[in-house]
Amino acid sequence: CIRDSIKSDYVLEVDITPNRADACSHYGVARDLYAYLIQNGRQATLTRPSVEGFKVDNHDMDITVEVENTEACPRYAGVSIKGVTVKESPDWLQNKLRLIGLRPINNIVDITNYILHAYGQPLHCFDADKIKGGKIVVKTVAEGTKFTTLDEVERTLSDRDLMICNTEEPMCIAGVFGGLDSGTTEQTVDVFLESAYFNPTWVRKTARRHGLSTDSSFRFERGIDPNGTIYALKEAALLVKELAGGTIASEIKDNYPHPVADFMVELNYEKAHSLIGKVIPAETIKSIVTSLEMKIVNETPEGVTLQVPAYRVDVQRDCDVVEDILRIY
């Protein structure tokens, strides 16, 4: 009985406004809670598992990656894992997924879903034997190309749909939905694990064109953290080794020709006080912004220059910072 196997727990349902892409994960919500608790005099720490244990075991699989359309795919990373055993996930992982309304499938798919909801980074796992030519090509395909997705529906592709392909055919609608024939099965032995950052506009338009809405497209449309792909990839790879066995059989392939920079925002204390309608001490303001992972790169008696993480797509102006201060204060 599922009810007996799941220990008592609290499940919080959080409504996320469209501008808060950074909060579309457990870690993202915890980040805000941490800032609030610190500001209110509570002891709190914000941590996530270390990936220092990630290492390449051998170089037995050499799947290459080529990104033809860097506008639609600013960053694409992946790693090969050889000799996995696809099976049922352990109870702890199954229970975590059930608690958030997901149905466990197998250890490989469950790991990608776990990372997605924990850190907001969608992942996709390909059966490496189905990557024809040993090469991943990220590109658009000819208008009218037929492609069958995981739900067994044959779809007609647009030449504006970004696809993850091998050397012969498309395997996945990038950031939206996998193909019927490229995913992992119980017979899968070798996998290629993908972690990417796709252009939100491209994903949104493709999802609408095909009438699709998935957990992955929901996050890509709003804008994930372009600089968090490698952490999520390493954490997923370590979990695959732990739960499915195998060896990390390649270096991480990371195509990131134009890194996305953090935002620089000037905050003037007097203007902040004017917008807020009251005076908040400078030390309190600095405490709030730093607890939200913004860095103070310059400071004067009149204000601060802040380095805002790239994942905070909603904080690009001083008034956006003021809104954050008010949320936490």
Predicted regions and their residues:
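RNA/tRNA-interacting regions in translation and RNA-turnover enzymes
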Residues: 3-329
